[in-house]
């Protein structure tokens, strides 16, 4: 499922650009040759959700995010079976919330997030920075693991939320200085869950990856590929 929108980042006072991710992905993906390592016959392309207007201001962007939440949840409910795995490409991190609402309705759910930000901002208004705040508040998650957080991107209020016993986390700086390994942390988290586990890969966790929170410091693309191959 492609989602070409930028209202989530705009409602969070971020930069535009997330609306272009699916177009960049699809140019390559839809020209992929069949090869035995990946069962392409098991993949279905449902379509693309496309933003057709820009919000006039932040309040309108917030309202549009709420409308998008409902649209994505309806789309998943009507067209994706409980035993299928939806893969969302593009858009802001706000789209994690309707995914979690859909998945948790079909059974217990935990999520692992590779992210420089915890996405635990206050729930006073919807935007790309508070999907997991809403998910925990609504009781959608059994556990939440977020790895590769950047110290400078997570304030005292967010760090206080990280003390929640449902949350497992580690800062990117800990990986730079200590004996910790991302792969070990994520596989350890997943192995302790006895139910469905969702995966979010935030593009700003990858060094030099174009995103609304671009950073030259982060994981390499090959490290993320290795992680996903191991999880698969």
What are the language-model segments listed below?
Residues 2-232:
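Conserved alpha-helical scaffold segments that buttress catalytic/binding sites
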